[in-house]
């Protein structure tokens, strides 16, 4: 029985490979014909991965190396942590990338579907707030200022930078962030607004952080948050904003 997992670790692929190898050995003990069939099956095998965009960069790197070393194909999708768990608990994927632990309701869904899994923490990441490179007035930002931008009460009301801080220009504020199925969205809203999933809804969303990068890069008044790894990959095109306790 293939044991599924909720997070990806380099060693995880070794576990999966060992299971496939064990099947081949079993077939070899039966007869050569069955062994040949098993090997052909391994060559055509596909490991399906989905979930968090934050974990995507690590997963994609390991997947590429794994495919070079084996004949097993690996597909890596980005549906967000929540969206990925829905697929995982329906048995549509083999590995679930997550930027948070599995929720109780997701445990129940997996149990009902007969999905067994192991959870493997692989890394710690931090969220990064970025703006357009042409933004020449923002050297830092406070949690309160971010809250004023992102809280539900800001929807349809806070439309310019000056409305957040009078010292800032009257430039249109364009926000980019993770979708509601994302673990990143849950974490950011809880840390900044004070309650998970509590956010204005009139901003551009994407489960793929590359889309957020492109959005901020193309809009002078843009601001976004996403995993630090995506900032590192795109730091030549973006400006990172330190979060401070007091404005100044």
Which residues make up each language-model segment?
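Flexible loop/hinge segments at secondary-structure junctions
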Residues: 23-248
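Bacterial N-terminal signal peptides that target proteins for export
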Residues: 1-10
């Amino acid at each position: 029985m293939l044991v599924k997992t909720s997070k990806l670790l380099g060693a995880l692929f070794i576990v999966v490979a060992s299971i496939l190898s064990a099947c081949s050995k079993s077939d070899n003990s039966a007869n050569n014909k069955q062994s040949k069939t098993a090997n052909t099956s391994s060559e055509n095998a596909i490991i399906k991965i989905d979930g968090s965009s934050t974990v995507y960069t690590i997963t994609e790197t390991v997947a590429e190396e794994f495919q070079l070393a084996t004949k097993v194909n690996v597909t890596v999708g980005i549906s967000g942590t929540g969206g990925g768990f829905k697929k995982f608990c329906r048995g549509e994927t083999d590995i679930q990338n997550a930027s948070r632990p599995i929720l109780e309701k997701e445990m129940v869904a997996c149990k009902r579907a007969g999905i067994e899994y192991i959870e493997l923490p692989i890394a710690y990441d931090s969220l990064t707030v970025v703006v357009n490179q042409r933004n020449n007035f923002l050297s830092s930002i406070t949690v309160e200022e971010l809250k004023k931008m992102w809280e539900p009460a800001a929807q349809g009301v806070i439309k310019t930078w000056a409305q957040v801080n009078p010292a800032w220009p009257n430039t249109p504020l364009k926000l980019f962030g993770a979708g509601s199925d994302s673990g990143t969205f849950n974490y950011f809203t809880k840390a900044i607004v004070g309650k998970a999933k509590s956010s204005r809804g009139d901003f551009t969303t994407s489960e793929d952080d590359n889309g957020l990068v492109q959005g901020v890069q193309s809009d002078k008044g843009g601001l976004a948050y996403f995993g630090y790894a995506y900032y590192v990959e795109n730091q030549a095109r973006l400006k990172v904003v330190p979060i401070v306790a007091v404005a100044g």
